[in-house]
């Protein structure tokens, strides 16, 4: 924790008392719950009849035509957000065959940082209570819509938040692969638009939540120590692990780089 952050009065007092209030308890993220409040940082959720809302609805309608395409298939593959699935999803971009078993320090870092960013996203979802796109306009989705989807909120996107969190952290760990890693993180969030379960504004807000939260998380000594350990782990894995198939990765990159709207 850095004691010079403005606007956090309780934190400032705790610094004077020598208390590290930003550090979360075991099992949480790197920050204490409630340490941040991003309501004034993230743009308000769009209103359906206003310009941002109209753009969301048009993008939702136009991307329904992607059903059956390679981009639609990628969106289906991006639905699972468990660590093993996400490591597979980023393996080509990273050029490292990561798994929770062979990179435990890396996955622990990614998941711990993701708990911080998810906490902020969940607070904003509850604050704005924005309906998902398929509740406003008809259109097919790439996954079965459970009751949980129908009663949960659109803005910001939790998947986009987590995907961008992973991308930013992995880019820090593997800086020579930063551009393709961040491109994959962008595409991971956009998959929710292709899938039809989130609006584009929700994906953009999810990225902003991840970036804003990580700006503070990165000041934590525990995070910095975890980065050093994960970087060493991935460097060792690069030396002994077989890189993902170049042909398969080339095909994936072509889909990642495909714009979903103009």
Q: Where on the chain are the PLM-derived regions?
A:
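C-terminal membrane module of polytopic membrane proteins
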Residues: 214-262
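Bacterial N-terminal signal peptides that target proteins for export
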Residues: 1-9
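Hydrophobic alpha-helical bundle signature of multipass membrane enzymes
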Residues: 24-194, 222, 226, 232-234, ...
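Short alpha-helix boundary/capping motifs
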Residues: 152-153, 198, 209, 228, ...
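N-terminal signal peptide c-region/cleavage motif recognized by signal peptidases
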Residues: 17-19
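Interfacial helix-loop-helix junctions of multi-pass membrane proteins
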Residues: 188-218
């Amino acid at each position: 924790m850095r004691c010079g952050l403005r606007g956090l009065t309780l934190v400032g007092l705790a610094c004077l008392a020598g208390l590290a209030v930003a550090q979360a308890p075991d099992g949480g993220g790197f920050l204490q719950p409630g340490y941040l409040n991003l309501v004034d940082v993230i743009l308000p959720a769009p209103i359906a009849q206003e310009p941002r809302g109209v753009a969301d609805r048009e993008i939702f309608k136009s991307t329904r035509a992607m059903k059956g395409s390679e981009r639609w298939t990628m969106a289906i593959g991006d639905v699972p957000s468990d660590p093993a699935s996400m490591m597979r999803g980023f393996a080509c971009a990273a050029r490292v065959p990561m798994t929770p078993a062979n990179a435990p320090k890396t996955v622990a870092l990614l998941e711990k940082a993701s708990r911080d960013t998810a906490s902020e996203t969940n607070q904003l979802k509850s604050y704005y209570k924005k309906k998902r796109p398929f509740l406003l306009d008809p259109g097919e989705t790439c996954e079965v819509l459970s009751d949980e989807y129908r009663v949960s909120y659109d803005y910001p996107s939790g998947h986009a938040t987590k995907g961008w969190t992973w991308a930013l952290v992995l880019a820090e760990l593997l800086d020579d692969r930063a551009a393709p890693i961040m491109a994959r993180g962008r595409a991971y969030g956009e998959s929710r638009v292709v899938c039809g379960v989130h609006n584009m504004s929700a994906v953009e807000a999810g990225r902003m939540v991840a970036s804003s939260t990580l700006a503070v998380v990165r000041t934590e000594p525990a995070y910095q120590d975890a980065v050093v350990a994960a970087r060493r782990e991935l460097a060792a894995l690069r030396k002994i692990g077989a890189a993902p198939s170049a042909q398969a990765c080339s095909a994936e990159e072509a889909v990642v780089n495909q714009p979903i709207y103009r």
